[in-house]
A protein has these predicted regions:
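Electropositive, gly/pro-rich neighborhoods at or near active sites that engage anionic ligands
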Residues: 1-3
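Glycine-rich phosphate/diphosphate-binding loop of Rossmann-like nucleotide-binding domains
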Residues: 5-58, 62
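Short glycine/threonine-rich loop/turn motifs
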Residues: 34, 51-185
Length: 186
């Protein structure tokens, strides 16, 4: 029986030392610190640091330039993340288009996990680019956490891996949710 489950669980050390978070803004105002603070909390669990804050206008050209700069300044083992000021709702939206404009590619758009379904995963100059869904502004568990945990350990994440996360992917009423959603019966 032991042979049947060999390899079912594997512990892998964190290989990333640092992550870069690029935020976009819709107006001239800098976005609230809520999203960055939530990501600092997530990265602290892994002993990782977050690079200094980078906020750019929510435009493809501006974000593409910031992505190119981040790729030039980031070791290949580290992670680039994008948190947009407006929801990334399709593969042609500003953030995925900026990854392509910067010379990268989008490997997966969307995931069958809620919250977190508007995530995208890309690659730029050999580095992963994680497009964070809006729910990443909250410290509550979401689908981006499942992808982040693998990426920071240097585990390649494929489109098929993300698709497989749909089994058990409804995270709405997890025990750690600070305020449970109301049910229709109430």
């Amino acid at each position: 029986a032991t042979q049947d489950v060999a390899g079912a669980i594997r512990l892998v050390p964190v290989t990333c030392a640092r992550a870069t978070l690029i935020e976009t803004r819709i107006s001239a105002e800098t976005p609230p610190d809520k999203g960055r603070a939530a990501m600092v909390g997530r990265l602290d669990r892994f002993g990782m640091a977050l690079a200094p804050r980078k906020v750019v206008p929510h435009r493809e050209a501006d974000l593409a330039a910031a992505l190119r700069d981040a790729a030039a300044q980031t070791p290949r083992s580290d992670l680039i993340m994008v948190l947009t000021g407006s929801a990334t709702s399709d593969p042609l939206d500003v953030a995925p288009a900026a990854v392509r404009a910067a010379g990268g590619k989008v490997l997966r758009f969307g995931m069958p996990v809620d919250p977190g379904n508007l995530l995208f995963l890309g690659e730029l100059s050999g580095r992963p680019v994680l497009g964070l869904p809006g729910c990443a502004r909250s410290p509550a568990l979401n689908g981006a956490d499942w992808v982040l945990e693998r990426l920071v350990c240097g585990i390649d994440v494929s489109s098929a891996d993300i698709a497989a996360m749909g089994v058990g992917g409804l995270l709405k009423e997890i025990p750690t949710r600070p305020r449970p959603r109301r049910s229709d019966a109430q």
